[in-house]
Amino acid sequence: MEFIPTQTFYNRRYQPRPWTPRPTIQVIRPRPRPQRKAGQLAQLISAVNKLTMRAVPQQKPRKNRKNKKQKQKQQAPRNNMNQKKQPPKKKPAQKKKKPGRRERMCMKIENDCIFEVKHEGKVTGYACLVGDKVMKPAHVKGTIDNADLAKLAFKRSSKYDLECAQIPVHMKSDASKFTHEKPEGYYNWHHGAVQYSGGRFTIPTGAGKPGDSGRPIFDNKGRVVAIVLGGANEGARTALSVVTWNKDIVTKITPEGAEEWSLAIPVMCLLANTTFPCSQPPCAPCCYEKEPEKTLRMLEDNVMSPGYYQLLQASLTCSPRRQRRSIKDNFNVYKATRPYLAHCPDCGEGHSCHSPVALERIRNEATDGTLKIQVSLQIGIKTDDSHDWTKLRYMDNHMPADAERAGLLVRTSAPCTITGTMGHFILARCPKGETLTVGFTDGRKISHSCTHPFHHDPPVIGREKFHSRPQHGKELPCSTYVQSNAATAEEVEVHMPPDTPDRTLMSQQSGNVKITVNSQTVRYKCNCGDSNEGLTTTDKVINNCKVDQCHAAVTNHKKWQYNSPLVPRNVELGDRKGKIHIPFPLANVTCRGPKARNPTVTYGKNQVIMLLYPDHPTLLSYRNMGEEPNYQEEWVTHKKEVRLTVPTEGLEVTWGNNEPYKYWPQLSTNGTAHGHPHEIILYYYELYPTMTVVVVSVASFVLLSMVGVAVGMCMCARRRCITPYELTPGATVPFLLSLICCIRTAKAATYQEAAVYLWNEQQPLFWLQAIIPLAALIVLCNCLRLLPCCCKTLTFLAVMSVGAHTVSAYEHVTVIPNTVGVPYKTLVNRPGYSPMVLEMELLSVTLEPTLSLDYITCEYKTVIPSPYVKCLRYSECKDKSLPDYSCKVFTGVYPFMWGGAYCFCDTENTQLSEAHVEKSESCKTEFASAYRAHTASASGKLRVLYQGNNVTVSAYANGDHAVTVKDAKFIVGPMSSAWTPFDNKIVVYKGDVYNMDYPPFGAGRPGQFGDIQSRTPESEDVYANTQLVLQRPSAGTVHVPYSQAPSGFKYWLKERGASLQHTAPFGCQIATNPVRAMNCAVGNMPISIDIPDAAFTRVVDAPSLTDMSCEVPACTHSSDFGGAAIIKYAASKKGKCAVHSMTNAVTIREAEIEVEGNSQLQISFSTALASAEFRVQVCSTQVHCAAECHPPKDHIVNYPASHTTLGVQDISATAMSWVQKITGGVGLVVAVAALILIVVLCVSFSRH
């Protein structure tokens, strides 16, 4: 059956379908039951049906099939028959499945909203019109096949791999709508159904392919739910990499192993001014195995081409023999290389030599302690270039030789564990040590080794120093060298090796020198006669010459060699080089670390006593969660008891790899605020010792002063009374005056004489006179208590109660503390309506600064190319735009060193040394980013209890962004404090953030942070200042000595200290991606609420309460809802009422209760007051509650207070009662004394 092209059909242009033969009509009848008598009848009916119902045109296909079979047997094409029977050949192509309903619907919608992206005439992907944007995957190269869209200015987002631009006005009608609603189920795209489940889009494997990048995924309403970027093959199904939307926020879903689905564009390479696809090299040369030298020259010519590795792969795998062994293609590149000899400073017993196992580089960037060692031998490859895991090959003089891998060893202070080998590289886990040795045993059972000084101290993962991974523990972020032999982004340079001197090739024969080549190409030069130099591949005799006058070297230009600073460069080939990928890339992974035993914790008064049991050295750190964190840390190696003071703001303790422990103190004490004076003083002394001592001292001084004043006034009055009678002989003191002044009437006597007289003569009068002042004091105290002007309980409750959270309009504004996890209630009073209670709780608060990246810094790698060594030739350095590049020419080096200098010079040589710095291979994972931090934006998650429903919303706290909770509009912010824990300059390293005044870009200092700088981990622009200085080589062996400052990045890693996650004030939690501070308990959060009229309940519709009374049977202050109050009421009708405390210092747990008839309700409240007096409003009626609260029994709790904490505790009613009594008694004494003094003075003045 032939189909109309899809675009034509769905482009709304109708064309009649071509005629095709009608299908054969077959009547399918039910299978007859097996009956003995009806068997023949059933066969007859079946035969008749076949004869009458079968169509004639069906015979034609049988002939075609017959001809087809004959044609396959003959295998001789006939021109006439082939021309006529060409359509039957294409019949399998016509059997394509007809597009289903999903495909047809998608094609119809796609016809208007997607456009092809073309590059050099080929479709590489698609662009889609969605909403008011045209979207194209950023990895799709090319331009949109539309004149209007091609000229748009696109904005690129590398994070989402997307490019966007505004749709032209005249094309907005063609755009598709988008939606963030994605219920699990099936969706549609160009190739059929897409399943969405578990947050992932999947399709049957094979339904998508490269070239589909940019295609949209639609729901059943034709709305775009995602745009395809690529896919990851997972067996029977393929997981799609897509860009989608979640509540108007763009998100990218990338499954592991996803590949981009843009159509690959062939990369071109160059050969003799002729371009060709890099994946298809020409046949001259086309294969390394046929023409190795020419193939390597071709690769060197294209070493900087983007398709170099395609060309390398194609050149090395073009042989059929190698294709059959493609499972070992990762080792295939090593057939174009060879091992080599290089200088080793210690080959055993302190002697240096040219070793076959020379150490080139030791890398220790992995935080799990694994070492990556580069040596001069090659592991896993035999001398015939075949792969064998059990073998290694090394350079034996100038010929490679095989050895067993089992003889390979690595050791520091003790033998290491080799975890991976390939080519020049070894992975090993080693104990601590100061040297590193690599060795092997060759086929002759001779041991070779090389030792380098190297300080190895495995880093600490996490906060515990452990030696082996536990079976159970905590997964911690770390980095390691992945044990993968596949090609990676890391690479090394290789070049053509220099000629290798070999004196054994020459022998003296009767005054002549014979050169034996042994099937090699040998370069020779003799200083006897003329024309005694050149290349030879056959044995050659130099007449009339001596061996000492000749020099012979093996020339091999069929293999590359690692570009080592320990081996000279081939002078003839200059800077020609190649590149190969290396195994074992550094990657971020997780390492399982132990979790320290939980400490035994004992709580004291404002302190925590922790008994620690470390199994190995474990880090203990703690900080205050207030404005001054006072961060402290220490490594605990043995059992230890620590005492930590818990401040009012809370204490955060981190022990090992456990989650942090958080503690808050409670106002616990041994005394009570409702007892005797000494108990009250003890209560306040334990809570506030300094203030209590000051207050008691001042009060005692005042009282004693008052008593002293009273005594002084009495003495003055008595003296005024006695003086006139003492001066008059025989005077008699009046009775009333003698009674007031305590003197005898007839004869003035001292008080002591009067007291002695009464004690001896009239003891009842003595006691009566002593009781009179006490009785007067008691009477005066009772009078003072009955005075209406006396002060009631003086508490901070009266101050805090002013201005309860009420408002008389539907526009309500309130301010809540910026404390996460503490509910906050506000009451909305509107005239004519029943009060409404709103409960709000901050679930999280985020401060996200605006960052601008200055640069990234990481460990640098010093690149030392093989030096140029020439014989008495002039060499000149050339300027190169390389980071920290240094070049020097040294003359007169390596005197009389033929073999060492690889040079035909018997006097002196000239060496050109070069060096520069570049980013280490570890920079892709191990780097620190230097940011400038600007104004921070605040946002938060808010839980709102509104109309009986708990709703969680996210809002920006900027005073402008509005969120809707049902039918109410909430506007949060701006925050009362613009505080942020981040300085103007911050450094981000993995998941840690540090405040640091780093040097600006281009001004780094050697050995410090920023000594090497780059804009991004992938960028090529690198600035470096490492104090790299080349030094003169010493005699003995070819080398490039230099001096350089140590890596500033590695030094910073050791000295960086604690991150903001541990040192930030106000208990901030710091996170990255993006950089943000969460749940900082600082400042207040204003909230504006716009409540519609329909949300209120009229007073006539709400129940009214009467006869309300409140009783508090139990109350524990400073505890989480430790108070209980019983409110009795009489309700007019059944209904719901809002419950709210009219005092800030008291928080009620319940927000709404149901009332009915004469009943009572119990509410729980929390307060910090010892003597709480507050009013509770239920519906529109208020009731007064008074509670005498006792201190909590728990000293420390692991949750913050749910009530307003007062800076100074209130004074209880009992304490005020004692103050009134004591003050009243002393005041009465002073008043009586003053009255007596006044009367005496008046009488005294009247006489004069």
From Swiss-Prot:
The residue ranges for the Extracellular side of the membrane come to 262-692, 749-763, 817-1224
Q: Which organism is it from?
A: Chikungunya virus (strain Nagpur)
Low complexity bias: where? 73-85
SUPFAM superfamilies linked: E set domains (SSF81296), Trypsin-like serine proteases (SSF50494), Viral glycoprotein, central and dimerisation domains (SSF56983)
Protein's recorded name: Structural polyprotein
Provide a GO CC annotation, any one: T=4 icosahedral viral capsid
- The UniProt annotation puts motif Nuclear export signal at 144-154
The SS bond pairs are C113-C128, C269-C278, C283-C287, C286-C318, C344-C450, C347-C353, C416-C430, C478-C591, C526-C550, C528-C545, C721-C742, C858-C923, C871-C903, C877-C887, C1068-C1080, C1110-C1185, C1115-C1189, C1137-C1179
Q: Region Interaction with host Mxra8 receptor: start and end of each range?
A: 351-354, 387-389, 509-512, 541-547
PTM summary: Structural polyprotein: Specific enzymatic cleavages in vivo yield mature proteins. Capsid protein is auto-cleaved during polyprotein translation, unmasking a signal peptide at the N-terminus of the precursor of E3/E2. The remaining polyprotein is then targeted to the host endoplasmic reticulum, where host signal peptidase cleaves it into pE2, 6K and E1 proteins. pE2 is further processed to mature E3 and E2 by host furin in trans-Golgi vesicle.
Q: What else is known?
A: Belongs to the Old World alphaviruses that usually cause fever, maculopapular rash, arthralgia and myalgia. Structural polyprotein: Translated from a subgenomic RNA synthesized during togavirus replication.
Which terms in the Gene Ontology molecular function aspect does this entry carry?
A: RNA binding; serine-type endopeptidase activity; structural molecule activity
Site note Cleavage, residues: W261, S262, R325, S326, A748, A749, A809, Y810
Q: Where is the active site?
A: H139 (charge relay system), D161 (charge relay system), S213 (charge relay system)
Q: Where is this motif: Nuclear localization signal?
A: 61-99
